[in-house]
């Protein structure tokens, strides 16, 4: 069977899918056309049902649930891994964030959902690709920005400061891991096929962990601007046991996020 598969070029995703797409494991006759795109593009594609299997932000899951099913493997959940709100200078009162122009990495992202949960009255948002946000803050194009991925490791080097850890805010309020990104598969495939894909992704993650901390050429080739230490930070932060299987705790966290979505109607 042949599938279209999309995920991001970020080290956590290439680490997870390397063994699967490069046939380092037995793919049991399953083959893939692979699309590597930023998460906002993948979110948009999911809304138009472009791909059979895709990484998405959990923030877009409520919108695509009628056409896609969430798989239990390959995703990113965790603690201490959430988005950060950063600026050029500290502020005295976080309430002033409501009056600021804020850069956010995409409308249908978990980052936007978490920001909206913390600052429901902040309406002056500019939606940018995640790697453009630091520059927008530094140039003064926006007053502050919500950063994700490797920018969590680089903002201090650029002289920026953290205003609030949105992930910590989530954990404090809701006492569960943060669902950041998940893997979805079109509902047109039967449960048996979905389970096979889920199992293959699980095996791919397990294979990657067995060979870690080696950084493969596949991971390195899609993260050429990063040092290997930053690649490992990225993997260590976003790939864990929840990536192998959501389990009961992970599934409860996803249900919590869906409840928050309904309450905030932020996206």
Give residue spans per PLM region:
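Hydrophobic/proline-rich hinge and linker segments of small-molecule sensing/allosteric domains
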Residues: 70-93, 170-188
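A short beta-strand-loop structural module common to alpha/beta enzyme folds
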Residues: 27-41
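Secondary-structure end/capping motifs
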Residues: 190-260
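Bilobed "Venus flytrap"/periplasmic-binding protein-like clamshell domains
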Residues: 2-22, 36, 83-143, 150, ...
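Pocket-lining segment of extracytoplasmic ligand-binding domains
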Residues: 130-219
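A structural signal for short loop-to-beta-strand junctions that line the ligand-binding cleft
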Residues: 3-4, 67-76, 101
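Hydrophobic residues within well-ordered alpha-helices
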Residues: 45-47, 137-138, 197, 261
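Beta->alpha turn/N-cap motifs
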Residues: 38-40, 46-62, 129-130, 147-153
């Amino acid at each position: 069977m042949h599938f279209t598969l999309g995920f991001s070029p970020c080290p956590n995703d290439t680490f997870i899918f390397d063994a699967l797409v490069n046939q380092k494991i037995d793919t049991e006759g399953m083959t893939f056309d692979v699309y590597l795109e930023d998460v906002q593009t993948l979110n948009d594609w999911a809304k138009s049902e472009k791909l059979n299997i895709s990484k998405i932000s959990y923030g877009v899951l409520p919108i695509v649930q009628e056409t896609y099913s969430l798989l239990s493997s390959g995703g990113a959940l965790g603690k201490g891994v959430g988005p950060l709100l950063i600026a050029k200078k500290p502020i005295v009162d976080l309430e002033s964030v409501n009056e600021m122009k804020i850069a956010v990495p995409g409308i249908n992202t978990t980052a936007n959902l978490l920001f909206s949960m913390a600052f429901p009255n902040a309406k002056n948002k500019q939606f940018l690709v995640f790697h453009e946000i630091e520059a927008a803050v530094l140039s003064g194009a926006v007053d502050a920005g919500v950063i994700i991925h490797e920018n969590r490791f680089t903002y201090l080097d650029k002289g920026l400061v953290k205003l609030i850890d949105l992930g910590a805010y989530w954990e404090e309020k809701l006492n569960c891991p943060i669902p950041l990104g998940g893997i979805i598969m079109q509902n047109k495939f039967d449960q048996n096929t979905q389970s096979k894909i889920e199992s293959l992704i699980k095996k791919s993650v397990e294979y990657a962990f067995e060979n870690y901390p080696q950084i493969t050429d596949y991971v390195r080739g899609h993260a050429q601007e990063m040092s290997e230490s930053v690649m490992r930070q990225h993997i260590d932060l976003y790939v864990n046991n929840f990536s192998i299987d959501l389990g009961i705790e992970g599934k409860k966290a996803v249900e919590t996020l869906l409840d928050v979505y309904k309450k905030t109607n932020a996206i």
